[in-house]
């Protein structure tokens, strides 16, 4: 537990975290998708005003795109190990996004896991998914290849538009 004092306005914090004998998150088929729970609470004058709980998996993921004997490689490396990607493209489950229940997400990820997939790509013509999607992906050892929502049309390249794209990318990452 750590207490920090915030100033009015935007506060950017970086707090050290220590985990005894940490286990790495592994993709489906490689071992356990180890997750660690953490919680952030905001109190004002001793009164709880906000609380956020989340799970994280400790891992490194890298896209390897290097010159090789055939031209250029392109593969994922997870925790320093090359990964053979087995997955599918994902489009929104329903045109009415709020109608996608937790149970439907759970069924989707059960099916993905049972099909021995380890990655799912969210198509750029779809939508940024609900947090439940990403949480279930983590819990089931599924990497998410997240397209940005820029598909099927040319886009402007003026500074104002590019600034908005940058903001969208930062928000969604």
PLM-predicted stretches and their roles:
Residues 100-104, 129, 164:
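Short secondary-structure boundary/capping elements
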Residues 1-120, 139:
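Secreted/periplasmic carbohydrate-active enzymes, especially glycoside hydrolases
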Residues 109-112, 118-163:
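Aromatic-lined substrate-binding rim segments of carbohydrate-active enzymes
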Residues 73-78, 131-135, 172-173:
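Short amphipathic alpha-helices and their capping/turn segments at secondary-structure boundaries
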Residues 25, 88-90, 97, 123-125, ...:
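Long, contiguous hydrophobic alpha-helical segments, chiefly transmembrane helices and signal peptides
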Residues 161-173:
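An active-site-proximal structural segment forming one wall of the substrate-binding cleft
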């Amino acid at each position: 537990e750590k207490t920090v004092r915030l100033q009015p306005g935007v506060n950017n914090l970086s707090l050290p975290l220590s985990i005894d004998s940490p286990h790495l998150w592994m993709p489906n088929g490689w071992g356990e998708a180890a997750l660690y729970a953490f919680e952030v609470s905001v109190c004002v004058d001793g009164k709880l005003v906000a609380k956020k709980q989340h799970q994280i998996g400790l891992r490194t993921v890298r896209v390897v795109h290097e010159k090789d004997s055939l031209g250029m490689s392109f593969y994922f490396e997870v925790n320093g190990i090359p990964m053979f990607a087995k997955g599918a493209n994902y489009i929104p489950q329903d045109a009415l996004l709020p109608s996608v229940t937790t149970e439907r997400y759970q069924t989707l990820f059960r099916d993905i896991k049972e099909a021995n997939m380890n990655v799912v790509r969210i198509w750029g013509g779809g939508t940024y998914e609900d947090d439940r999607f990403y949480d279930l992906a983590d819990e089931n050892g599924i990497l998410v290849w997240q397209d940005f929502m820029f598909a099927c049309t040319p886009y402007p390249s003026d500074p104002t538009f590019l600034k908005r794209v940058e903001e969208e990318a930062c928000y969604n990452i």
